[in-house]
From Swiss-Prot:
The N-terminal destruction box (D-box) motifs 1 and 2 act as a recognition signal for degradation via the ubiquitin-proteasome pathway. InterPro entries: Oocyte-zygote_transition_reg, Prot-tyrosine_phosphatase-like, PTP_cat, Tyr_Pase_cat. This is Protein tyrosine phosphatase-like protein egg-3. Disruption phenotype: RNAi-mediated knockdown causes hermaphrodite sterility characterized by the production of oocytes lacking an eggshell. Prevents the polarized dispersal of cortical F-actin following oocyte fertilization without affecting the formation of the F-actin cap. Impairs egg-4 and egg-5 cortical localization in oocytes. Causes a loss of kinase mbk-2 cortical localization in oocyte in meiosis I. RNAi-mediated knockdown in a mat-1 (ax227) mutant background, restores mbk-2 cytoplasmic relocalization and mbk-2-mediated degradation of pos-1 and mei-1. Its main location: cytoplasm. GO terms for molecular function: protein kinase binding; protein tyrosine phosphatase activity. The keyword 4Fe-4S does not apply. GO terms for cellular component: cell cortex.
Amino acid sequence: MRTSDSHLPLSNLARSDSIEFKDAVINEKWVHSANRRKGHLTPKAPEKKSGWFGGQKSEEELLMERVEQHELEELQTFIAQKLFRVDGIICDEETRILLVEKLMNAKEYPTINHDELAHRYGSSMAGWLRDRLVPSMSDCSSVLQRAAAEFYQNKMSDPLCNWGQLNPEHVSMVAARIAKFSEEMSSKVKWSLLVEPGKFSCHLTEFVQEFNRLDRMFVSNELSDEESLQTAFNANYLTKARSKMVPCAEFSRVKLNDGLGRLDDRNELRNGMFSDEHEFLQEEGYTAKSTYGTTDFIHANYVKGGPLLNTFICAQAPLKNTQEDFWRMVFQEKCQFIVMLNSAVDSSTLGPLDSANRNHCPYYWPRAENESLRFGSFHITCMKVDSKADPLFTITKLKVQKVGGNLLDAEFDEELFLEHWQWDWQYLGDVHWPFRVLRKARQLSTPTIVQCIDGCSKSGTLVSIETALMHFIRGSPITKSLILQSCVFVRLQRRLSVSSVLLYLFIYRVILRWIEPYVNKWYHRAALGLRFKSIGFIQKYNAMIQEFSRITPAY
């Protein structure tokens, strides 16, 4: 974060402590050296003004310490996750080879082949795997330098990182919004001796009640006729929706206007749903040749307007029969960035019972370099696999080509290049990754597709985080319940977004991560868990996700 002494109202943002993040390799000396080579996003702290008895640190110095400490922790986490991923791949490959050795009775056993690793994980990750096979961390300086360079990529142009360079009036406005939000959030943290008898601890009841308000919002407040309309969904949900309980609003849905879709035969659909013994379905009106659905429907909605800098599309994971529709949408909207937050399976490996389960997402994109797939009029080619640019996501660079009027013609009319980021997000304790994903989305002028199984829970959470963050930078003056307002804004356009209280709390936790250096008051820092690790919002949140999700991070 780059700041300016003449711009920031530092007296409103300072505090009186700094936490030392200890690491044998990636310490302050190392990161400052790296920053001089790559360019630092924060200015050097002012020199300490000392008097006869050593003096006292100024508010400006304390703020600079917190900002630099915040960025250092981000960098350390990024590199630690990246190195853990490399070690995990190496461990998996060595385990695979060991198992093959035990099962095979041969003179020569397989080894870790660089070309095979490049095919599976991309050439960049294969280089990381090679460089990581060294005896100690002290030999990994080049690896760490490459990771630091990737961490700082695109940060200089990110409004979340450079808002301190704006005009003083705008900076004061952002600082006031941060102060107001931290005050409101800390006031919702309540304390009690009864939650854990004999121990003074906090509870998050008010946050849970706020989520319940969100859940009842559209029940208590009737939508207009235009907002409640879902005509296309009602005409297509049997074949193109994973659940009829997750509607698709008509006014914000993505309409496919190329006319390339196909319609299902109503009789075939009926026979697949009911047995022949249902005689009431054999009447003349039901046996006539007819079709079901429309060609312009896909279960996806735009989320745009308000404080957002760019447009998002929240979409459900493609079904086996809607993969072509998905690529129709990608090509129509000229999307350059797809964020996939769920796992996928190979449809050919599923049995009859598994195939009937609509909770599976097929591999709708080619995963190996130079591999291609064809869906109707669209030819998708994997240009490159990059498993090292981000420590969590597998990045596939794709080329989408549309066949001309003659479907047998090998020539393509148009081409589209995009990046597909895939990660099965389950653990709610990592609050760093949304900033990396959203930073890339802000750089693009075309819509960003955010996709999970239902297109609402995880997808809506990520877009709600962006909505809340942009409220600080360019939104209207914050009154109350910023997170609630942001989620209502997203839910109005994409129904049932942010489907659980844990996802709702995750939004608060991510926003808290961003404002952390700028929270100045002692009580606010204590209530939010920024001053003491054993009490406050952060401690209670971590306990809740461990209790309810039962998932721990791999790193």
